[in-house]
A protein has these predicted regions:
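A conserved mid-to-late transmembrane alpha helix and its immediate loop/hinge
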Residues: 184, 188, 227, 338-373, ...
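Transmembrane signal-anchor hairpin modules in multi-pass inner-membrane enzymes, especially those
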Residues: 1-89, 106-119, 151-158, 209-217, ...
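Loop-to-helix entry and N-terminal half of a specific, functionally important transmembrane alpha helix
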Residues: 17-25, 68, 218-224, 373-403, ...
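Alpha-helical transmembrane segments of multi-pass inner-membrane proteins
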Residues: 24-25, 44, 99, 115-253, ...
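Hydrophobic transmembrane alpha-helices and their immediate junctions
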Residues: 51-55, 207, 211-218, 244-246, ...
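Long extracytoplasmic/lumenal interhelical loops at the membrane interface
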Residues: 177-180, 283-284, 290-354
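Perimembrane helix-loop-helix junctions
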Residues: 45-55, 100-102, 242-264
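A membrane-periplasm/extracellular boundary helix in multi-pass inner-membrane enzymes
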Residues: 72, 130, 136-141, 233, ...
Length: 455
């Protein structure tokens, strides 16, 4: 133990920015919304001081520049936004969270460091999975008078502290909490589900590439905890998307890893499917029964209303109403009599906020990022599993965003920059076929298919 502490001290002296990056990835999802960003800002200052001392310049890469273009346009929308404070503060939040992507791209410049980042992300998700499981089990046992109220782990974990902080802010912040659905350290079950959905494919990558039996067992347990954490949220879309992610990875990796993938699938389906059935009250009666069908109807009403709005307003159609979901909430409330804060769909939300221009900028960014993963020559099983597990995390994250707004808070937004930073680092570390046009993209895609079939 003393030797490990001594090695850690030496590591911090030689590379403090890297140590801060690991701490940020572990702590950011676990701390309150109003604390986590400051951990990131402090870590970035340490990183920048280290880089300046070593006379090195921080790079942002092509993906980083494209993100800066998107965020620059979002900031520019303050000029025509009817809620300029909300627009400016939301854009500023994106610029702040972008610092994580910069840190990952500059600090994770080796394959071992990429694995260390993935292990840290998984460890953080496991903690949230345990908390979420305890919350939902405590609620259920208390509901049937098996344990007293004082023995129930409150959900969200920082519920009391959140209420104190938000009531003392100079501006209003309201959050809707659910006692019958676990939220972990987040303020909402959907936010916890986002964390679990992203970590699920990463835990599979670690399980498939574990070198020892002990590592294999730990990675398997990590996947079980993440699945349990996702199940505890009773989030239908998150559970279904996670299962779809497993199916996709099985199709890609079954030639070499079909036994391991089925080993992972058994506990996954054992805890996730009952969650979906419980939400609809099919196998168990919980406080959230009846809300599921109402929620689906409400989502369709929201989407229909906002599409009607942008099609009826030319300026909103092309350049949007301004970044930030405050104006979206106003439109829904005062024009369509729907008391909802956002679109519950990131594509429609950004269409309302930033118009067709914003959708195009974001679409190019995401397609380019997927292309950078596709460039990598996956000529061995480790690279194949890494590329497709990170790609699956990105797809699941965006897929979940089709039923909920996934950029609603710092702790949810940070996952976008985590995945983009990982994409940049993986692209930097591994051999690739450079994509310059549609022909090279097609050639790279064919190579990926051949590599997949030959594994």
């Amino acid at each position: 133990m003393k030797e490990k502490l001594a090695a850690l001290k030496i590591e911090y002296r030689t590379n403090p920015g890297w140590c801060w990056l690991l701490a940020i990835l572990f702590l950011f999802p676990l701390l309150p919304e109003y604390v986590s960003p400051f951990i990131l800002f402090a870590g970035f200052i340490v990183f920048k001081v280290q880089w300046s001392r070593e006379r090195r310049k921080a790079k942002v890469g092509t993906i980083g520049k494209m993100m800066m273009l998107f965020m620059g346009y979002a900031l520019l929308s303050t000029l025509w936004s009817p809620t300029p404070f909300s627009t400016f503060s939301t854009a500023a939040l994106w610029w702040g969270m972008f610092l994580l992507q910069v840190m990952i791209y500059n600090l994770a410049r080796s394959r071992d460091k990429i694995d260390a980042l993935l292990q840290t992300c998984t460890a953080s998700a496991c903690v949230n999975g345990v908390i979420g499981t305890l919350q939902i089990c405590g609620y259920t046992l208390n509901r049937y008078d098996c344990i007293p109220d004082g023995a129930v782990l409150v959900t969200p974990l920082y519920k009391g502290l959140d209420k104190f902080v938000y009531t003392h802010l100079p501006f209003a912040i309201s959050t809707k909490t659910f006692d019958s659905r676990a939220s972990g350290t987040f303020s909402n079950p959907n936010l916890l589900a986002t964390h679990m959905v992203i970590a699920y494919p990463i835990s599979i990558y670690l399980f498939l590439n574990a070198k020892t039996k002990k590592q294999k067992v730990l990675c398997f347990l990590a996947n079980v905890l993440i699945s349990a954490g996702l199940s505890s949220t009773l989030t239908r879309a998150g559970c279904v998307i996670a299962l779809a992610g497993w199916v996709f990875m099985f199709i890609v990796l079954c030639r070499r890893y079909w036994k391991q993938m089925f080993t992972i699938f058994l506990p996954t389906i054992a805890v996730i499917v009952p969650s979906i059935l419980t939400r609809y009250g099919i196998i168990f009666s919980s406080g959230g029964n009846g809300e599921a069908k109402k929620s689906s109807v409400a989502h369709f009403n929201i989407w229909e209303s906002l599409i009607d709005y942008v099609l009826s307003h030319t300026r909103a159609f092309f350049i949007g109403t301004g970044f930030g979901c405050e104006e979206t909430g106003n439109i829904l409330k005062y024009m369509y009599n729907l008391d909802k804060p956002h679109a519950h769909n990131f594509v429609i939300e950004f269409w309302v906020e930033l118009g067709v221009v914003g959708i195009i900028l974001l679409g190019i960014l995401l397609i380019w990022s997927a292309g950078k993963l596709l460039e990598i020559n996956t000529n061995n099983s480790r690279k194949l599993t890494l590329v497709f597990c990170v790609f699956t995390s990105l797809v699941l994250y965006l897929g979940f965003g089709l039923s909920d707004f996934i950029f609603n808070s710092p702790k949810q937004l940070i996952f976008l920059f985590l995945l983009l930073g990982l994409t940049q680092s993986i692209s930097y570390c591994y051999d690739k076929t450079v994509i310059t046009d549609a022909r090279t993209l097609e050639r790279a895609a064919r190579k990926e298919i051949r590599n997949t079939l030959n594994q």
